[in-house]
From Swiss-Prot:
It holds the Pfam family RimM. Disulfide bonds: none annotated. The PRC barrel domain binds ribosomal protein uS19. It comes from Parvibaculum lavamentivorans (strain DS-1 / DSM 13023 / NCIMB 13966). GO terms for biological process: ribosomal small subunit biogenesis; rRNA processing. Binds ribosomal protein uS19. This is Ribosome maturation factor RimM. Residues 103-177 form the PRC barrel domain.
């Protein structure tokens, strides 16, 4: 699931997907899901915009390649649907099941804002996002020294530890990932 930076105790929301455009002329929308199963985008009740200003009842109408086709209540024509392009759809975290696969139980959204720390303790920056462009999950890291974010494969080898309670993700980046040779010790 996609990120919602929220480390200050506010009600945490999790982004289930983003509207990519209109589908047809009756107000259906195409949604890129961030859920493990694409149909999960409509499985947790009404969705809302990031700022919480607008809420929609959502229902799944079909699939189109890697997108889901959804009906958002109150969106009844193509122009309104098209205007929603880029709108992220959120639900309150408490509506989601406990995350599995780890004794801590975390979602990708929980990683946003955590420190990215090397095996040697080096501060690489903060996790800015988790992306997937089709070839696997990538951590987007905002470097500690500033500049452009860096994408790194989110694999067991590159990310040996996620420590939510400690506020950090331990990384072992491949050589050259951060534009220097400090990672060359890894032997790559």
């Amino acid at each position: 699931m996609a990120p919602t930076p929220d480390r200050d105790g506010q009600d945490k929301k999790v982004c289930l997907g983003v509207v990519t455009g209109a589908h047809g002329v009756r107000g259906l929308v195409r949604v890129k899901p961030y859920t493990e199963m694409p149909e999960g985008v409509a499985a947790y009740g009404p969705v809302e915009t990031k700022d919480g200003a607008t809420s929609f009842a959502i229902s799944l109408k079909g699939m189109a390649k890697d997108l889901v086709i959804c009906k958002l209540e109150g969106v009844d024509d193509r122009d309104v649907a098209a205007a929603l392009r880029g709108t992220e759809l959120y639900v309150p975290r408490e509506r989601l099941p406990r995350a599995s696969g780890d004794e801590e139980g975390w979602y990708y959204a929980d990683l946003i804002g955590l420190r990215a720390v090397g095996l040697d303790g080096r501060d690489y920056g903060r996790i800015a996002g988790v992306e997937n462009f089709g070839a696997g999950d990538l951590l987007e890291i905002a470097p500690a020294e500033g500049g452009q974010t860096v994408l790194m494969g989110f694999t067991d080898e590159n990310v040996p530890e996620v420590d939510i309670a400690g506020g950090r993700v331990v990384i072992d980046p491949p050589a050259g990932t951060f534009g220097d040779d400090a990672e060359a010790e890894r032997g790559e």
